[in-house]
């Protein structure tokens, strides 16, 4: 139903509107959303082994880019690494969180064909992130290395609203592009 509401709302506007699926966990869900008119999907295979994540993400990218070849542009965001926290139906404990391995990013992007890549460098999802005294332990060295290995490629930081104000400037200095972010006071 959401797609039809959005389509009706944008009929009389020239505004560019994106309808995005966040944390799709299966090919079938991503395909259904693309078929229903979504312009962007995130396939989250971060709970799978590396090779399974590559295969699932590539399958979604192949389908989305085939749709794009027929004239309707659809972008795909992949995820490499696992953020701690709770968002949508995804609940990842600290113990199960996993930083993105910079040694895997080039291979993942080239083998899957993703249009953007969500990475895990220490940010966290949902209400989990607002516990007092738990500032994120950001791996800015990973961000630097990933940006170096994927120059100009769109990198996504999920859970970035958990970042304290003074870290926003640091992230931007390390290749981030969050000019209007204010962070947590």
Predicted regions and their residues:
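Alpha/beta enzyme core
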Residues: 1-14, 23-154, 165-180
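Short acidic/histidine-rich active-site segments
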Residues: 159-162, 182
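Short, glycine/polar-rich helix-capping loops at beta-to-alpha or helix-loop-helix junctions
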Residues: 185
């Amino acid at each position: 139903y959401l797609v039809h509401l959005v389509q009706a709302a944008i009929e009389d506007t020239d505004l560019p509107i994106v309808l995005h699926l966040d944390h799709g966990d299966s090919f079938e869900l991503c395909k259904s959303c693309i078929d229903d008119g979504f312009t962007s999907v995130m396939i989250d295979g971060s709970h799978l082994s590396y090779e399974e994540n590559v295969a699932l993400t590539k399958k979604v990218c192949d389908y989305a880019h085939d749709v794009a070849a027929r004239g309707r542009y659809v972008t795909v965001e992949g995820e490499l690494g696992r953020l701690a926290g709770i968002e949508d139906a995804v609940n990842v404990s600290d113990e199960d969180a996993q930083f993105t391995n910079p040694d895997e990013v080039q291979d993942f992007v080239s083998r899957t064909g993703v249009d953007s890549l969500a990475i895990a460098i220490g940010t966290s999802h949902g209400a989990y992130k607002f516990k007092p005294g738990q500032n994120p332990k950001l791996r800015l060295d990973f961000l630097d290395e990933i940006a170096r290995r994927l120059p100009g490629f769109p990198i996504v930081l999920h859970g970035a609203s958990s970042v304290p104000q003074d870290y926003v400037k640091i992230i931007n200095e390390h290749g981030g592009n969050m000019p209007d972010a204010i962070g947590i006071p």
